[in-house]
């Protein structure tokens, strides 16, 4: 079985080798764990953002950033492009931000390959029938501070590896790398909704691709949390190749999948978050989805699509100003 940790290790090693070129910093902790600062005390880079995103996806996806990417003729933003031939494992078995790390004063959302060793959350791995038994643990952290030895020890223990084999990559939401990796979740937003909200067997998704604009750096972590979510919810476009069976209603799936099917659709995410008293669990799960979904049913040959980009919301979210 493919190992998301072993597939990601060469990418991590390449980042370490090219740290100066990528504007990142490599920190060796006293217990032997390795921290890659991709945006806390450094600037990061587009290349670091691509590598970080690819690691989040367990090394099982191609990731590109196109500065010429457009949401529409009205609005030009750089875009992240993702394609994978292992969508369930790459997005849900690795990329899903399913591990909350809360140790002392350190807090982060954890995603990436190490989740497959710790099996967090366990139900996800049972659904996709996947496990990893590598002796190295690579965890991507969305955080505004760097982890210490205690955090590394915690990860090592949960993953069943020696702490010297732990790699922790860190990028704040309000950093270039952080913004890129969140937009890089465009495909995962769809597979997550398929599994968690629509209870569709994601193992039937055989190939997937997606593109989403990258939010510019417009403010602090809270402002960027809103903007980065909006990039996918109102600008993300996805394509799923599905091997259905006779009982699947692919057209109904396609209509239910995009963010426009949610009751919270139509306003910047930060407004929705504030209305929910800053509680993610009060927000409709169906909101976390790409704007556009295209499904190719490989069994029937059908090609269906639903949803569209919402440029006006993107402009409002970013405070986009067209100069005259």
UniProtKB/Swiss-Prot annotation:
GO terms for biological process: methanogenesis, from carbon dioxide; one-carbon metabolic process. Gene3D superfamilies: Methenyltetrahydromethanopterin Cyclohydrolase, Chain A, domain 1, Methenyltetrahydromethanopterin Cyclohydrolase, Chain A, domain 2. Pathway: One-carbon metabolism; methanogenesis from CO(2); 5,10-methenyl-5,6,7,8-tetrahydromethanopterin from CO(2): step 3/3. Its EC number is 3.5.4.27. GO terms for cellular component: cytoplasm. Its main location: cytoplasm. It comes from the Archaea. GO terms for molecular function: methenyltetrahydromethanopterin cyclohydrolase activity. It is an enzyme of class 3 (hydrolase). It catalyses: 5,10-methenyl-5,6,7,8-tetrahydromethanopterin + H2O = N(5)-formyl-5,6,7,8-tetrahydromethanopterin + H(+). It is found in: Cytoplasm. Belongs to the MCH family. Catalyzes the reversible interconversion of 5-formyl-H(4)MPT to methenyl-H(4)MPT(+). This is Methenyltetrahydromethanopterin cyclohydrolase. The gene is mch.
């Amino acid at each position: 079985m493919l190992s998301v940790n072993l597939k990601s290790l060469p990418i991590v090693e390449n980042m370490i080798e090219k740290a100066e070129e990528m504007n990142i910093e490599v920190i060796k902790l006293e217990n032997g764990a390795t921290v890659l600062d991709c945006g806390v005390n450094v600037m990061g880079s587009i290349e670091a953002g691509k590598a970080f995103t690819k690691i989040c996806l367990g090394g099982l996806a191609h990731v590109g950033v196109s500065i010429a990417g457009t949401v529409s003729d009205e609005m030009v933003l750089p875009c992240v492009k993702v394609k994978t031939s292992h969508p369930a494992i790459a997005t849900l078995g690795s990329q899903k931000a399913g591990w909350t790390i809360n140790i002392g004063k350190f807090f982060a959302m954890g995603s990436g390959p190490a989740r497959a060793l710790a099996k967090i959350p366990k139900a996800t791995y049972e659904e996709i029938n996947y496990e990893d038994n590598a002796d190295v643990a690579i965890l991507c952290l969305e955080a505004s501070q760097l982890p210490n030895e205690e955090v590394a020890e915690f990860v090592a223990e949960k993953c069943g590896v020696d702490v010297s084999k732990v790699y922790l990559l860190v990028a704040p939401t309000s950093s270039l790398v952080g913004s890129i990796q969140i937009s890089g979740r465009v495909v995962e937003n769809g597979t997550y909704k398929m599994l968690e909200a629509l209870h569709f067997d994601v193992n039937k998704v055989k190939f997937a691709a997606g593109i989403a604009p990258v939010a510019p750096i417009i403010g602090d972590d809270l402002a960027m949390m809103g903007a980065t979510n909006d990039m996918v919810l109102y600008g993300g476009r996805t394509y799923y190749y599905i091997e259905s069976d006779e009982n699947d209603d692919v057209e109904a799936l396609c209509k239910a999948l995009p963010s426009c099917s949610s009751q919270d659709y139509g306003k910047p995410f930060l407004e929705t978050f504030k209305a929910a008293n800053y509680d993610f669990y009060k927000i409709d799960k169906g909101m976390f989805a790409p704007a556009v979904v295209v499904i190719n049913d490989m069994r029937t040959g059908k090609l269906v699509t639903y949803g569209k980009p919402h440029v006006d919301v993107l402009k409002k979210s970013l405070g986009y100003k067209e100069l005259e």
